[in-house]
Amino acid sequence: MIQQQTLLKVADNSGAKEIMCIRVLGGSKRKWGNIGDIIVASVKSATPGGVVKKGEVVKAVIVRSARGLRRTDGSYIKFDENAAVIIKEDKQPRGTRIFGPVARELRDKDFTKILSLAPEVL
């Protein structure tokens, strides 16, 4: 579960390395986000010459969560880290590459471009 102040790794080549969650979108009292949810985040560290800079406020979609997710068939999927992909306003990724595996649940939430760029879909 991702909440305010959670640090996430960035799983794309947009230039950011680490972001911190400011808000989970989807209601005024929403406290936690999981895989496929959109968050507003601040860039905490970035590579020089990247698209995004340190201190910039961005929107991102959660692609990996250490908490895990229960699927409809009763199985669970859990990752070693919390990771997100920085997106534009039209839900397209700002980077051109995705690093690491992503969950299949992103297809239900219309993030097909992220799924097509990912090296592995679990």
From Swiss-Prot:
CDD domains xref list: Ribosomal_uL14 (cd00337)
Segments passing through the bilayer: none
SMART domains on file: Ribosomal_L14
Alphabetized UniProt keyword annotations: Ribonucleoprotein, Ribosomal protein, RNA-binding, rRNA-binding
CC per GO annotation: cytosolic large ribosomal subunit
A biological-process GO annotation: translation
GO-annotated molecular function: large ribosomal subunit rRNA binding; structural constituent of ribosome
Pfam families on file: Ribosomal_L14
Subunit and interaction comment: Part of the 50S ribosomal subunit. Forms a cluster with proteins L3 and L19. In the 70S ribosome, L14 and L19 interact and together make contacts with the 16S rRNA in bridges B5 and B8.
PANTHER family from the UniProt entry: 50S/60S RIBOSOMAL PROTEIN L14/L23 (PTHR11761), LARGE RIBOSOMAL SUBUNIT PROTEIN UL14M (PTHR11761:SF3)
HAMAP family linked to this entry: Ribosomal_uL14
Family, as annotated: Belongs to the universal ribosomal protein uL14 family.
Purpose: Binds to 23S rRNA. Forms part of two intersubunit bridges in the 70S ribosome.
Protein name: Large ribosomal subunit protein uL14
Organism lineage string: Bacteria, Bacillati, Bacillota, Clostridia, Eubacteriales
Gene that encodes the chain: rplN
